[in-house]
Amino acid sequence: MIRNVHAGTVDVLGEAIVTGRYPVGSTLPPEPMLCGELGVSRTVIREAVKSLIAKGLLITGPKVGTRVLAEEQWNWFDPDVVAWQSRAGLSRDFLRDLQELRRVVEPAAVRLAAERATAQDIAEIEAAYAGMKLSIDEGGDYVSSDLRFHQGLLRACHNRMVAQMSKALGALLRTSFEISTSRPHGPASSLPLHRAVLDAVIARSPQKAERAIIVLIDGANDDIEQVLSTCRKLPSLGQPARQLKARAKASAR
């Protein structure tokens, strides 16, 4: 119960910061005011503030109170920060930064995966791909399998730092996939592109793997641009992952 109260308070305050209710550079209201507004104790408020400091959203100091830091200092690899931004609305700048990060990290990662992936690594990536295909053919959660696919590639590098990055990138990648696959037939059209990446890794061809992942990322970027061009407001991801409906017999491999 105490943990739920703490997590709920962190969530309310974090989202209030990210949505701009407490703008960058502003000072949070005094503890008594926050206690009254949220219906929690001072101890809960203080612990929540500590959590938000750890996430890079706040700083405290003598005579300045608790102040909201600039967005550049927020921990964008923190799943909570990404979730708050996703609920608030995904700006073009946020999505641009995310796609640029993918283009920097994933091509180099799949080159290493093509050189180092074990039989077990490949089996796990194959299983993720099978989950993607099944969700298209019979309906289901495509995005979770898509995330497993990409995180499997990162783990297959057998680089400890990249493996840690795969955990941190999880929320960011899921955000990208939720937007890019929201177009009609988006998942079905991206499935062969994923297959090309997997085949190149199986064939131990770093160059082909790199080219294939770049095509995949650029295709996702085009899908995101299409989604943004048809939105009257910034897309948000406050709901559970979209479930695909079953389709007619799939032609994708």
Identify the function of each model-found stretch.
Residues M1-V104, R111, T230-L234, L244-R253:
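Short linear motifs at protein or domain termini
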Residues N4, P187-A188:
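Short helix-capping and inter-helix turn/linker motifs at the boundaries of alpha-helical repeat units
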Residues S26, S86-S91, L134, E178-S182, ...:
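Short amphipathic alpha-helical segments at helix-loop
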Residues R46, Y142-D146, S182-P187, L228-L234:
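Juxtamembrane/interface motifs at transmembrane-helix termini
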Residues L69-W76, G140-S145, S205:
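An N-terminal domain-start capping segment
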Residues L98-I179, S190-D199, K208-D223:
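Conserved amphipathic alpha-helical segments that form helical-bundle/coiled-coil interaction surfaces
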Residues Q207-R253:
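C-terminal effector-binding regulatory domain of bacterial HTH transcription factors
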